A protein has these predicted regions:
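Short, low-complexity, Lys/Arg-enriched N-terminal segments of secretory-pathway carbohydrate enzymes
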Residues: 1-39
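N-terminal anchoring/stem segment of glycosyltransferases
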Residues: 29-148, 175-176, 183-184, 259
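Generic preference for well-ordered alpha-helical elements
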Residues: 92-96, 124-131, 156, 160-164, ...
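Short coil/turn segments at secondary-structure boundaries
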Residues: 96-100, 114-115, 162-165, 215-217, ...
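A generic structural motif
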Residues: 110-120, 179-187, 203-205, 279-287, ...
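GT-A fold catalytic core of metal-dependent nucleotide-sugar glycosyltransferases
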Residues: 138-214
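Intrinsically disordered, low-complexity, Ser/Thr/Glu/Asp/Lys/Arg-enriched terminal regions and linkers
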Residues: 194-249
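Catalytic core and acceptor-binding pocket of nucleotide-sugar-dependent glycosyltransferases
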Residues: 229-354
Length: 354
């Protein structure tokens, strides 16, 4: 699924009311009637297409026949569901474009989360309200732990790759990611999984770290990609963000098993409760807390790879709290989309987005 910011779209394309008003002012009589007839035919066509989609696609996409690693979908004898979730507290033309793009590419019918949310579920007041809406769905939707979940921000994420192709791509990406981790340790993938380490939750990436910080582990400790050295041309890594490595977690998109995602979202909300600081400027940023958990996971992985020691020079920068025992979870199976194979963020990528 290649994703773009809908801010590039011309609003006039979707502003039917304004366009109709101009027609009434400039073309009365026969022209107005013709416009109304065309508008009605357009609505009828759209309704017909939606009904056809509902008949043939039903509620959830069947992903049982898509090739996948056995640890991601536990049983090949049941039909795993695909959940397509869109956090959005209001309905507008951007949200409609996001939903339409998903339907056109045969994803399961999107579920809007947090619509008209109030109090602590009001995403207009705090982005972390999005996490509460996601948690509520993952705990109460009745889905199985090995169902596949896709979550996209409701105002700026457009699907462009068909669902079947995206699902196959996801499983391939996670299998390759597990193989790289196993190779780093000189073990097999099965042995890697026995240690509890694996990759299942794939988040989008940014070229810049946000919220910005020179000392926060989110911004300096997370791993670099394995992209070719000059992937962005001769200016790669020369200081301009548009030519830098895309390695920082972006919380706007994620794909992964429902069970793993549920545990991770629960952990993010627990972190918010434990570390809440009313005076912290970015206290309401869901991305801050999610990226903090990712940085701690990577910190512990590097320590485990090096006999309990962190291999890099800290040089006055902050590091996460080390794992404190069996009940202190640091491994959440989080990976990021270094290659833009799942999502293509627009920030700092204007030159490379067609």
């Amino acid at each position: 699924m290649k994703l773009f910011n809908t801010s590039n779209l011309n609003p006039s394309i979707y502003s039917h009311a304004e366009w109709s008003e101009r027609v009434r002012m400039l073309a009365p009589g026969r022209e107005l009637q013709r416009h109304r007839n065309q508008k009605n035919r357009g609505r009828a066509f759209l309704i017909a297409m939606v009904l056809i989609f509902l008949i043939f696609n039903c509620r959830n996409l069947d992903i049982k026949n898509v090739s996948n690693p056995s640890h991601l979908l536990a049983s090949s004898h049941r039909i795993s569901r695909l959940h397509y979730l869109v956090p959005a507290n209001i309905a507008n033309r951007q949200v409609c474009a996001v939903v339409t793009s998903a339907l056109a590419n045969r994803y399961s019918i999107p579920t809007i989360l947090g619509y008209r949310g109030e109090s602590f579920l009001d995403a207009q007041k705090a982005h972390i309200a999005k996490l509460r809406g996601i948690k509520d769905y993952l705990h109460n939707a009745g889905g199985a732990s090995d169902d596949l979940v896709i979550i996209v921000d409701g105002f700026d994420v457009m699907a462009q790759i068909p669902a079947e192709a995206m699902i196959q791509r996801y499983f391939n990406l996670m299998a390759e990611a597990d193989q790289r981790l196993a190779d780093q340790r000189g073990i097999t993938v099965k042995e890697l999984h026995r240690t509890g380490v694996r990759q299942t939750l794939l988040w989008g990436t940014d070229k810049g770290c946000w919220p910005e910080s020179e000392t926060d582990p989110r911004c300096w400790l997370v791993p670099f990609s394995a992209q070719p050295r000059l992937i962005w041309g001769l200016k790669t890594d020369t200081g301009d963000l548009q030519y830098s490595d895309s390695r920082f977690l972006n919380s706007g998109t994620v794909i992964g098993p429902l069970g793993d995602l549920r545990k991770f979202i629960d952990a993010a909300l627990s972190l918010i409760e434990d570390d809440w600081d009313q005076n912290f400027l970015f206290r309401d940023s869901d991305q801050f807390y999610i990226a903090t958990l990712y940085a701690r996971q990577e910190y512990q992985r590097m320590r485990d790879l090096n006999g309990g020691d962190f291999p890099e020079d800290i040089a006055g920068r902050d590091v996460p709290r080390p794992e404190g025992g069996k009940d202190d979870v640091t491994e959440y199976h989080v990976a990021v989309d270094f290659d833009y194979a799942f999502t293509q963020t627009e920030c700092h990528n204007y030159r490379f987005v067609p």
